[in-house]
Amino acid sequence: MKVKVLLFASLREVVGSSQSAVELEPGASVEDVWTRMISLYPRLAPHTGTIAFALNSAFTNPHEALHDGDEVAFLPPVSGG
């Protein structure tokens, strides 16, 4: 199955693009997308454990199952005042 990946802020800078697409086996989870992105872009690895996950525009947990055509977003922590 194919899913669209959206990357924000520092994650976008690491990858060099705000979006990507990945192919995964049926039954894959949001976490599997993150693992695939790390394999493609190893500089994403230090962000593990600090990012938020969204599936089809709603925050979700990393174990959420995916379907073909889903949109997964990875968001780094936000700071500021």
Where are these regions (language model features)?
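Ubiquitin-like/PB1-type beta-grasp interaction modules and other compact soluble beta-rich domains
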Residues: 1-80
